[in-house]
Amino acid sequence: RLIQGGARFVATNPDPTGPSMEGDLPATGSVAALISKATGVEPYFVGKPNPLMMRAALNRLQAHSETTVMIGDRMDTDVVAGLEAGMRTVLVLTGITHAADVDRFPFRPSRIVDSIADLVDDLPPL
C-alpha cells in the first residue's frame, strides 16, 4: 500500500540468494522481486553494485580506487561493483559464483581464488 501510495521503493541489493551452511537461501533481491511483481514498481538499489555506494565507501575510508581491491563471492554484484568503481577485483569461490559460472559474464575479475585464505600471503606486513 505504501509504494502504491507513492512511497519510494528502496532495497539494499539485487542478490536473489545468499549462501548459508544449509545451501543458498532467498535474499534481498528475491523479496524485492516479490514486491515489484505485486506493485509494478522497480526498486532503487542502494547497495552493491550501485557505484554511489562504492564511492561513498572509498570516501569514508579515505581510499582510492587505484589502491583498493574489491573482494567478493558474486560476479553480478561484488565484482561488477568493484570494476565500475575502477578497482581491481577478486572473486572468492566459497560463495554464490562458482568457477564454471564465470564465463557467463561479459567481464572478468582481476583474480579468482578458492578461498579468502589464499590472499593472506599477499597482505603487506603490519
Task: Give the residues covered by each predicted segment.
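Asp-based, Mg2+/Mn2+-dependent phosphohydrolase catalytic module
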Residues: 1-126
